[in-house]
């Protein structure tokens, strides 16, 4: 996928590690033997098999798998429909739908990319249709989906690494992130509301909105 670029970068780093002490100036470092470099890369917690990789293989994989099960089961579309039914009628409702849908989906997926792909395919065209410009629509969706990484209970990979480095239960990190996550999405909500007011946008028409009761019945 990456091609030879990564191979070249690794080769340059190895060459620099072995012969970098011969360089004069600020780029110079103390002399390292090849055996020391190999030992440091493969047998210490700061090398390739480090704490972040261990956490990823042990804990993050399980939560990602759980989130994918929910997405495949239709939870993603359910959250989108629920957001449209709840927020679509308000001023600038399309953008607010994107925010709410991304925040809810963020509770089961800590991946900003997966969040964007799942919700953006629906919310970005909807925002453009209701009067938002394309670049603004994409920005709202990207920022909303990125916030899913700090939305408990399933956050981004960094949250698991933080818990591992600090030696505290993951739940403490998740609880500490509740207030920042709420403030993050509230600020984003007010931003799109002010933009909608300035542009004179209105909510979606009643016939375009799904009924809340129908959405809940279908989802459960």
Question: How would you name each of these model-derived features?
Answer:
Residues 157-170:
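Transmembrane helix-loop junctions at the membrane interface of multipass transporters and ion channels
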Residues 80-148:
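Hydrophobic transmembrane alpha-helices that form the pore/transport pathway of multi-pass ion
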Residues 175-220:
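Long, contiguous bundles of hydrophobic transmembrane helices that form the permeation core
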Residues 7-8, 57, 95-97, 174:
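Hydrophobic alpha-helical transmembrane segments
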Residues 105, 137-159, 175-191:
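Membrane-embedded alpha-helical segments of transport systems
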Residues 1-65, 82:
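Hydrophobic transmembrane alpha-helices of multi-pass solute/ion transporters
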Residues 54-64, 171-187:
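Alpha-helical transmembrane segments
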Residues 47-55, 170-176, 213-218:
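Interfacial loop-to-helix junctions that mark the boundaries of transmembrane helices
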């Amino acid at each position: 996928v990456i091609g030879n670029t990564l191979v070249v970068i690794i080769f340059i780093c190895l060459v620099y590690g072995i012969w970098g002490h011969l360089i004069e100036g600020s780029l110079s470092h103390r002399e390292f033997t090849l055996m020391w470099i190999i030992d440091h890369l493969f047998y210490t917690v700061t090398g390739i098999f480090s704490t972040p990789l261990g956490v990823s293989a042990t804990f993050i994989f399980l939560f990602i798998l759980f989130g994918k099960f929910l997405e495949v089961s239709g939870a993603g579309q359910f959250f989108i429909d629920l957001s449209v039914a709840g927020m679509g009628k308000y001023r600038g409702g399309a953008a607010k739908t994107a925010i709410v849908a991304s925040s809810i989906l963020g509770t089961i997926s800590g991946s900003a990319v997966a969040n964007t792909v799942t919700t953006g395919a629906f919310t970005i065209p909807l925002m453009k249709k209701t009067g938002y410009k394309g670049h603004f629509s994409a920005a709202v969706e990207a920022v909303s989906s990125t916030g899913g990484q700090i939305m408990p209970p399933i956050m981004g990979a960094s949250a698991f690494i933080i818990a591992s480095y600090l030696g505290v239960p993951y739940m403490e990190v998740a609880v500490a992130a509740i207030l920042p996550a709420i403030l993050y999405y509230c600020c984003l909500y007010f931003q799109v509301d002010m933009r909608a007011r300035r542009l004179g946008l209105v909510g979606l028409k009643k016939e375009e909105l799904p009924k809340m009761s129908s959405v809940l019945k279908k989802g459960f």
